[in-house]
Amino acid sequence: MSKRDFYEVLGVGRDASERDIKKAYKRLAMKYHPDRNSGDAGAAEKFKEVKEAYEILTDAQKKAAYDQYGHAAFEQGAGGFGGGGFGGGGADFGDIFGDVFGDIFGGGRRGGGPRAQRGSDLRYNMELSLEEAVRGCSKEIEVPTLVHCDACDGSGAKKGTSAQTCGTCHGHGQVQMRQGFFAVQQTCPTCHGKGKIIKDPCNVCHGQGRKQKTKTLNVKIPAGVDTGDRIRLSGEGEAGEMGAPAGDLYVQVHVKEHHIFERDGNNLYCEVPVSFAMAALGGEVEVPTLDGRVSLKVPAETQTGRMFRMRGKGVKGVRSAALGDLIVKLVVETPVNLSARQKELLKEFEESCGGEAATKHKPKAEGFFNGVKKFFDDLTS
């Protein structure tokens, strides 16, 4: 059976650049790869055909011969190139698929020998009072972690000895497995990717190069932090393997509930009780802030639930120098534990206002009852 044109196989024109050829090859190789088409003989043939076309068209000398003579250039005795299939020189699978199959099939090429594992990151949950969060503070914490073993200087080998190069992977930490025409790199099963074998392990860390320890750290909390904020302490996580960098420690902030204030961003909220008389006649009430007490003027005829904004009496955020506001909600308290005389006076006051049915001095009641009347009128109309 005659061979298909190599340009047709890859779906590119004869003027295609090497980049276009490589792009087409990757797409088709992924489509017909045996690992994706197990037991499909047709896909295997197409994969072989695509590979052969790629090897010819990305080799300048072979491409020139193919462009001039076609497939005849690679037949026995036609030009000394030898077979144009898988057995020829061709491209290195690892170079071609390093960025494509590395994640899909685990076969991505990794250069530079074994890679020591960076230490794991750690998290510490820290509770703060509102005052501590707003003003900033320093906190001493204890963190159980893995630290560099001083006895073996992190090598894992007993003092006076050293780790030996792994004989299986020759220090690379990986071995190459071939599945047909496809090369896959895997972690070395002997040294588990470290590239070295410890024959005489350290008595302190038992060959790990790291040991358990509880570290005491002083953490500076910046002013303005809030629940959900995270403080990163670089290099304070677990020690890395074989001298690799340590991980980081993340301090997760949680601000406890306050008995007076609620915080929303840079604003603070609080409720302040006022007497029935002050709400009706007006006056002044002391309001708490994080910096001390301040006076708030209460206008006459203030209704319960009215909000007052005290500008600049909130807090500064960790990312902003602007002060928030204090939002004060006045709550009119109903008097309790009244004496007989006090009850008498209240009854006299109620009668002076026209009794329970009167709404002249009760703006909310007037609005409410008018609304109720309209509601029932609409139902019966």
UniProtKB/Swiss-Prot annotation:
Keyword hit for Cell membrane: no
Query: Per UniProt, what is one GO molecular function of this protein?
Result: unfolded protein binding
Binding residues for Zn(2+) 2:
C166, C169, C188, C191
SUPFAM superfamilies with a match to the protein in the record = Chaperone J-domain, DnaJ/Hsp40 cysteine-rich domain, HSP40/DnaJ peptide-binding domain
Q: Which GO terms describe its cellular component?
A: cytoplasm
Question: Zinc finger spans (CR-type)?
Answer: 136-214
Point out the coiled-coil segments of this chain: none
Note the SMART domains from the entry.
DnaJ
Q: Name one GO biological process term.
A: response to heat
Show the PROSITE patterns listed in the entry.
DNAJ_1 (PS00636), DNAJ_2 (PS50076), ZF_CR (PS51188)
Q: Does the keyword Zinc-finger apply?
A: yes
What does the entry's cofactor note say about binding and number?
Answer: Binds 2 Zn(2+) ions per monomer.
Q: Which domain of life is it from?
A: Bacteria
Q: Which cofactor does it need?
A: Zn(2+)
Biological role: Participates actively in the response to hyperosmotic and heat shock by preventing the aggregation of stress-denatured proteins and by disaggregating proteins, also in an autonomous, DnaK-independent fashion. Unfolded proteins bind initially to DnaJ; upon interaction with the DnaJ-bound protein, DnaK hydrolyzes its bound ATP, resulting in the formation of a stable complex. GrpE releases ADP from DnaK; ATP binding to DnaK triggers the release of the substrate protein, thus completing the reaction cycle.
> What does the sequence similarity comment in the record state about its family?
Belongs to the DnaJ family.
Q: Which PANTHER family match?
A: CHAPERONE PROTEIN DNAJ, DNAJ HOMOLOG 1, MITOCHONDRIAL-RELATED
Domain observations: The J domain is necessary and sufficient to stimulate DnaK ATPase activity. Zinc center 1 plays an important role in the autonomous, DnaK-independent chaperone activity of DnaJ. Zinc center 2 is essential for interaction with DnaK and for DnaJ activity.
Q: Output the NCBIfam families linked to this UniProt entry.
A: DnaJ_bact (TIGR02349), PRK10767.1 (NF008035)
Question: What is known about its subunit structure?
Answer: Homodimer.
Q: What is this protein called?
A: Chaperone protein DnaJ
Q: Which organism is it from?
A: Vibrio cholerae serotype O1 (strain ATCC 39315 / El Tor Inaba N16961)
Gene name, please? Answer: dnaJ
